Amino acid sequence: RKLYWPFIASPERPLTPLLFAYSPSVLPKPADWTAPNLHIPGYFFLDQPDYRPPQDLQDFLAEGQPPVCITFGSNIHQGAQQVTQAALAGLARTGNRGIFLTGWGGWRPESPPPGTLFLDSAPHDWLFPRCKTIVHHGGAGTTAAGLRSGLPNIVVPHATDQPFWARRVAAIAAGPQPIPIRQFSPERFVAALAEAEGENIQAGAAEIGRRIQAE
């Protein structure tokens, strides 16, 4: 049996399947991707069906309206405190509740304001559907989970591929135009929250959620 290593050019060598793990509903397959070994099967998820939420999270969700979830994943940003304070100000101005998943680079106040809850992390597949809007950095995995929830996504890209996915979210009407991390402010956050409540984005987010769930 031949291994054709390292990728020896041979007419006998079978084509290596190439899987692109994102949803074709988010980024359609390019017209020039005609090779039979190129596949876009949809997102891959690693759900946690056995997750049991801590009591403080259960209590917070039961106390009021679905919150805005704010998570920047494993990103470490020098302005984490300023960004968090801007998000808190935006929530206060709009009367929204909020859950902050602080991750590796998060900051939390010593005394969180009423209507907010700060956690290190929580499974996206469990938490996101219980929220109102998802605010995140645009990482591929968080974008996938946010879109699958069927809720509006407000993307605050930091670096690397995040601006690309942020633009795709807006292009499919699953969220407003992205807010680059260095431009994040209470005013821009308030405007994005208002836009996320509009009929167009609500419908777009729900539609992409249905498509991804069916893939």
Question: What would you call each of these model-derived segments?
Answer:
Residues 119-168:
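A donor-sugar binding/catalytic signature common to diverse glycosyltransferases
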Residues 102-123:
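Nucleotide-activated donor-binding/catalytic signature segment of Leloir-type glycosyltransferases, i.e.
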Residues 117, 153, 172-182:
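A short acidic/histidine/glycine-rich donor-binding loop in glycosyltransferase catalytic cores
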Residues 19-21, 40-41, 119, 156, ...:
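Hydrophobic residues at beta-strand termini and immediately following loops
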Residues 1-67, 73-97, 111, 203, ...:
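Nucleotide-sugar-dependent glycosyltransferase catalytic domains
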Residues 182, 186-215:
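C-terminal amphipathic helix plus adjacent low-complexity
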Residues 56-57, 122-123, 188:
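Short acidic active-site motifs
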